[in-house]
Amino acid sequence: MLNELSTRKCTPCQGGMPALDRSEAERYLSQAPGWSLADNGSRIERHYSFRDYRSALRFVVDLSQLAEDEGHHPDISFGWGHATVSWQTKKIKGLHENDFIMAAKTDQIAGDGNGSA
């Protein structure tokens, strides 16, 4: 099923706006299965499993291209058969709708959306 968030584009965040509060973040989180709040609700993260290093690397490269296209960049760590992605809007030191849009798009890149590809 295509997540509605994945069809949207990021809007430039200029800073100076408030981050989503916890209840707003949880509402968006309900549309991003597999993602969880981290750092006291200031970012979201998800762990993905892959069959080998090359698959994890391909995911990271594809996600990096998407981040460049959207102008919104995650923190990524990866190794053999795994990757962890974290989204946060750095200009507001918290979560913005863009983070959840990118989470949905990240799931599309990962393949089946359940954290394994």
From Swiss-Prot:
Could you tell me one molecular function GO term of this UniProt entry? 4-alpha-hydroxytetrahydrobiopterin dehydratase activity
> Lyase as a keyword?
yes
Reaction(s) catalysed by this chain's protein: (4aS,6R)-4a-hydroxy-L-erythro-5,6,7,8-tetrahydrobiopterin = (6R)-L-erythro-6,7-dihydrobiopterin + H2O
Q: Show the Gene3D superfamilies listed in the entry.
A: Transcriptional coactivator/pterin dehydratase
Tell me the first and last residues of the signal peptide: none
- Could you list this entry's UniProt keywords, alphabetically sorted: Lyase
Asked if the keyword Lyase belongs to this entry, the reply reads: yes
GO biological process annotation, one example: tetrahydrobiopterin biosynthetic process
Q: Which InterPro entries match?
A: PCD_sf, Pterin-4-alpha-carb_dehyd, Pterin_deHydtase
The UniProt similarity line reads: Belongs to the pterin-4-alpha-carbinolamine dehydratase family.
Q: What is this protein called?
A: Putative pterin-4-alpha-carbinolamine dehydratase
Q: Which species does this protein come from? A: Azoarcus sp. (strain BH72)
